[in-house]
Amino acid sequence: MDEVIQKGWSFCFVTGGTDDKVYADCVASIHDEFNGRDDFEIISVGQSSLHDDLALGIRAVPFTEPVFRPSFKNLRRARKARSLKTLFYRTGAISHKKNIAARHARFDKLCMLHDYVGLEAGWVDGFDKFGDHWQVAMNAILNKDDTRHRDWMNWDHPAITPSNKNNSACLMPYDITTSHMFISGTYFCTKREFFLSNMLDESLFWGDGEDVEWSLRVRQKTRFVFNPHSIVKYRKLKDTVGAPYDALWQGNQQKFEAALARGEITSL
């Protein structure tokens, strides 16, 4: 018998159990949003003490790291760690974890998120208002200090980097959509069926740019859409000196806005 997929949301967390207090706040934000509704579930892949708390309603999928992944690419890590084990095993298997979560999902919409991302009030109403006609969706992402973080982003627009050397990443205005974008792996929404047909590359681990690889691949098949009615927010303060706050991203954003004003960038 074919599996019956219900209308609703599967929240797919990847976790390492490093800060379960923050993680618990993220889980609570989902329950607060869906209070009285049964069209959602919370799936967690990894290790966490929260999995033992039945009241949280988490469908836990155990996942043990490090993962056996021999590769010559690990040679630098092995030299730095002075450990042969690092040559054969890796931690940070976020692509693998997200793929596992998607396979376990019972609902037709997936919300992929890391264990420090929480829903702001009105998130579910915002998506209800936004509608269901999308394959990959994004909304505003805020850092804990309420500054905008990596959400709606340019990757390689030729108006910014004519040589397409992939160093033109920057935040974009929310009302502009192009075919040169990428989606953050920290948080994004996608349809289950679409994701299962376009899964993450499991050879890519944390820090390998798995979100960029996935974005560049799937943007050939669908248009990313922005939901202006919903917001998520980090429950801990993330890097405030790197992207999107650093000089490169800020400079690229100024170039993007200038090219937009000159008419060199048009929205789809």
Language model feature labels by segment:
Residues 6, 105-108, 200:
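Active-site acidic short loop of glycosyltransferases
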Residues 7-12, 29, 41, 213:
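Cell-envelope/extracellular polymer assembly enzymes that use nucleotide-activated donors
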Residues 23, 176-177, 182, 204-268:
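C-terminal catalytic/acceptor-binding lobe
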Residues 25-39:
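Short, acidic, metal-binding catalytic loop of nucleotide-sugar glycosyltransferases
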Residues 46-47:
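Acidic ATP/Mg2+-coordinating residue in the GHKL
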Residues 51-104:
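Active-site-proximal specificity loops/subdomain of glycosyltransferases
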Residues 107-118:
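Short beta-strand-to-loop acidic/aromatic patch adjacent to the donor-nucleotide binding site
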Residues 120, 125-199:
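Conserved catalytic core of nucleotide-sugar-dependent glycosyltransferases
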